[in-house]
Amino acid sequence: MVEKTERIWMDGELVPWDEAKVHVLTHSLHYGLGVFEGIRCYALQQGGSAIFRLEEHIERLFQSAHIATLPMPYTQAQIAEACLETVRVNGLDSCYLR
């Protein structure tokens, strides 16, 4: 079950949960073509959190997009920063990122 957060990273910016929508004619909805990664973020005993193997997950995401001939509109560094910022802005310490 998905837990509602304050903000979701979408199209390069953090938007309120209720505003994160895709159009009904979105290509991936019509044709089922897309790539994604599931990434765990864990709470640390000393406080804060760590995203498990973030760089490796992002590299695999880009490899998958390349194989599927899907253009990536962001750099790997931008995706990594988006993951970190999403966790921080939502005050999460343990979560699952997609």
Predicted regions and their residues:
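Conserved alpha/beta cores of soluble small-molecule-handling proteins
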Residues: 1-98
